[in-house]
Curated annotation (Swiss-Prot):
Name by which UniProt lists this protein: N-acetyl-gamma-glutamyl-phosphate reductase
Chief place of localization: cytoplasm
Gene3D superfamilies: Dihydrodipicolinate Reductase, domain 2 (3.30.360.10), NAD(P)-binding Rossmann-like Domain (3.40.50.720)
Known function: Catalyzes the NADPH-dependent reduction of N-acetyl-5-glutamyl phosphate to yield N-acetyl-L-glutamate 5-semialdehyde.
PROSITE patterns membership: ARGC
Taxonomy of the source species: Bacteria, Bacillati, Bacillota, Bacilli, Bacillales
Uppermost EC category: oxidoreductase
The protein's Enzyme Commission number: 1.2.1.38
Location of the active site: 147
GO molecular function per UniProt: N-acetyl-gamma-glutamyl-phosphate reductase activity; NAD binding; NADP+ binding
């Protein structure tokens, strides 16, 4: 299968390129960038010297449609909603890594993203691509989930789908590595600001909140809201999410563990930890895994869920390829079947 990547020079686009090199059935047809349209990729990124024959081309929809079966959009929010339309209309597989098509309510999109919403008919056609819980596996237009949303939803799904928790009890403390802020530098991502530091940001206003709520209320419509905080931590990549919920009735750890194991028994990239073992960011680095650890406090009647992913892989490019594999009926782990980088 031939694919094109629009936004190839951003972190998610670069990760798509890396992962596709390992895929048995996918080859890159064209690469595109808004900021660098006439350069060789290897000139910008020497670590990709093996790809010297891969030029960055101007975005020409007609040319892309002729050369590709699938288009990955690794662009910032606010861009995909316009440039995706020719490829959707032409019947290509389209996987958008931005937030443009995730929210079905256009007013919510405009409130949380502070941009004009995509056209309604395209919003309705997009399938939310939480890979382990895809509703329509034949959909050819995928809104790839956000990194925080992926870690949070995979952590909560077994309990919420069974409606086992108090609807008002969900508290999520999510932390991200610096690459989650993207490639464009800013004061908040400057080395001197992030090194040996931890910063709370977008308190109660992160754009992944409505995305998480949209999916949670599909599973349990009684959930009114979540308390969700995000922090920047001084690591390059990774999402570390700690989730606290109250079960409707006490639950033994063994029962809790069995619930998670059974939910994800056919999910090759979700790994449930043993008792008193809690995942670290390091154990999923550069992989498509989501590792989940569980604890239950009988005294407070609180379940603690620790869910970790690599924000650039499972939280972006890896899940996008996983969604392509599902869509094209490839092996789900094709291009993704490698162990994490350690140490």
């Amino acid at each position: 299968m031939k694919v094109s990547i629009i936004g190839a020079t951003g972190y998610s686009g670069l990760e798509l390129i890396r992962l596709i090199q390992q895929h048995s059935s996918v080859d890159i047809a064209t690469l595109h960038s808004f900021s660098n349209q006439t350069n060789l990729l290897s000139n910008l990124y020497p670590h990709l010297k093996n790809l010297e024959a891969s030029p960055l081309e101007k975005i020409n929809p007609k040319d892309i449609i002729e050369k590709s079966e699938t288009v990955f959009l690794a662009t910032p929010s606010g861009i995909s909603k316009d440039i995706a339309l020719p490829y959707i209309d032409a019947g290509l597989n389209v996987i958008d890594l931005s937030g443009d098509f995730r929210l079905k309510n256009s007013q919510l999109y405009e409130k949380w993203y502070e941009k004009s919403a995509p056209l309604e008919n395209y919003l309705m056609r997009a399938e939310y691509g939480l890979a382990e819980f895809r509703e329509n596996k034949e959909s050819t237009f995928i809104a790839n989930p956000g990194c925080y949303a992926t870690a949070t939803l995979l952590g909560l799904a077994p309990l919420v789908k069974k409606q086992l928790i108090e609807p008002t009890s969900i508290i999520v403390d999510a932390k991200s590595g610096i690459s989650g802020a993207g490639k464009v530098p800013s004061t908040s991502t400057h080395f001197t600001e992030t090194n040996e530091n931890m910063t709370l940001y977008k308190m109660n206003s992160h754009q992944h909140i409505p995305e998480i709520m949209q999916q949670l209320t599909k599973w349990d419509e009684s959930i009114p809201a979540i308390q969700f905080s995000t922090s920047l931590i001084p690591i390059t990549r990774g999402i570390f999410t700690t989730i606290y919920v109250r079960p409707k009735k006490p639950i033994a750890w063994e029962e809790l563990h069995k619930l998670y194991e059974s939910t994800y028994e056919n999910a090759p990239f979700v790994r449930i930890q043993k008792e008193n073992v809690y995942p670290t960011v390091k154990q999923v680095t550069a992989s498509n895994y989501c590792d989940i650890g569980l604890a239950y406090n009988e005294i407070t009647n609180v379940i603690t869920i620790v869910s970790v992913i690599d924000n650039l892989v499972k939280g972006a490019a890896g899940q996008a390829i996983q969604n392509l594999n599902i869509m094209a009926n490839f092996a789900e782990n094709d291009g993704l079947g490698f162990i994490p980088v350690y140490p």
